[in-house]
């Protein structure tokens, strides 16, 4: 009996060692300052300097979150989407919301493709096919080996990113890598980045649309600050050159109001670190930083 137990223990240690080696060998960060392909719209409209436009930013949660879904990293119970049909139903509702707003520009985050957690639905293609009137760029923001975590319901392989849509002519787009932790947490923070999509304006200037999803579940405040510094510096450079910049995304920071210190992932947005040419534009009556540890209710969450 002792030999059997020891043999099983050795086997488990061997399997764990092989898996850890696999995760380390599979890990690689995408290069910084990566040129992104642009999918052209059927027709692009001219963006004018003296006209108001609407921009929408939306973390779609890889199409997994109906109202009663709770996410394990927030203290909830679920990891993956419930089914492929559920993913498609959630994406369809997301598209309905997008269409009802009819924005000129759209920044989407957590847009999956080839992801086990979202039943490998090609979500960038879903939105591009549904919205042929938009030019688009896509930047990878997650890519990982098979993550056997949590053990009871592994998240699996993740491939996801940032999708930017523009009715104005998009001439080029670039992906910039963000600093992340270098310890074991890097396998869960995946490959943070922001994208910059360049849109032409009728006065000869350019509009740079930034799409970003900053790290959430890290405790290293130095890394959190470094991510924002790189983003701010890039935006300031274009603003100083006389061009237009706008950034929309999932900051995992409180843009207005107070942060809750008991939530380690929630930080106040460092408005004081913005250059004089940049400012925060956020509604004060609709807090957008929300925990998903409990099912959503109109008056309770």
Q: What do these predicted ranges mean?
A:
Residues 77-83, 111-114, 178-186, 213-222, ...:
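Surface-exposed cleft-lining segments at the edges of enzyme active sites
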Residues 43-44, 149-154, 181-186, 294-295:
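Short, P/G- and charge-enriched loop/turn segments at secondary-structure junctions
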Residues 45-55, 64-67, 158, 162-172, ...:
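Beta-strand-turn-beta hairpins that frame and shape the catalytic cleft
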Residues 128-132, 157-173, 297-301:
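Conserved beta strand-loop-helix elements of the APE1-like EEP
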Residues 218-301:
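Metal-dependent phosphoesterases centered on the DNase I-like endonuclease/exonuclease/phosphatase
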Residues 54-60, 90-120, 165, 197-199, ...:
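Active-site beta-strand/loop signature of hydrolases that rely on acidic residues for catalysis
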Residues 2-130, 138-153:
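N-terminal, active-site-proximal structural segment of metallo-dependent hydrolase catalytic domains
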Residues 135-144, 173-179:
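Conserved S-adenosyl-L-methionine
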């Amino acid at each position: 009996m002792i030999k059997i137990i020891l043999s099983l223990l050795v086997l488990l240690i061997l399997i764990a060692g092989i898996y850890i080696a696999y995760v380390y060998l599979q890990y690689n960060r995408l290069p910084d300052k990566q040129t992104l392909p642009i999918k052209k719209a059927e027709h692009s409209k001219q963006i004018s300097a003296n006209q108001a436009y609407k921009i929408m930013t939306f973390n779609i949660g890889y199409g997994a979150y109906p109202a009663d879904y709770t996410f394990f990293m927030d203290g909830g119970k679920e990891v993956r989407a419930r089914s492929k049909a559920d993913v498609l139903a959630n994406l369809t509702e997301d598209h309905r919301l997008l269409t009802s707003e009819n924005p000129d520009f759209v920044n989407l985050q957590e847009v999956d493709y080839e992801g086990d957690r979202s039943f490998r639905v090609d979500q960038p293609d879903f939105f591009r096919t549904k919205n042929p009137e938009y030019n688009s760029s896509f930047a990878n923001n997650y890519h990982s080996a098979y993550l056997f975590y949590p053990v009871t319901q592994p998240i699996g392989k993740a491939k996801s990113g940032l999708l930017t849509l523009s009715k104005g002519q998009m001439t080029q787009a670039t992906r910039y890598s963000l600093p992340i932790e270098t310890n074991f947490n890097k396998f869960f923070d995946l490959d943070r980045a922001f994208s910059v999509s360049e849109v032409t304006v009728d006065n000869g200037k350019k509009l740079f649309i930034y799409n970003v999803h900053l790290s959430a579940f890290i405790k290293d405040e130095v890394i959190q600050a470094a991510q924002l510094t790189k983003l701010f510096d890039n935006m300031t450079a274009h603003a100083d050159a006389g061009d237009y910049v706008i950034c929309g995304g999932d900051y995992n920071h409180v843009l207005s109001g107070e942060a809750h210190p008991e939530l380690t992932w929630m930080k106040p947005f460092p408005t004081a670190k913005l250059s004089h040419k940049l400012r925060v534009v956020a509604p004060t009556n609709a807090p957008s930083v929300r925990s998903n540890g409990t099912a959503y209710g109109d008056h309770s969450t």
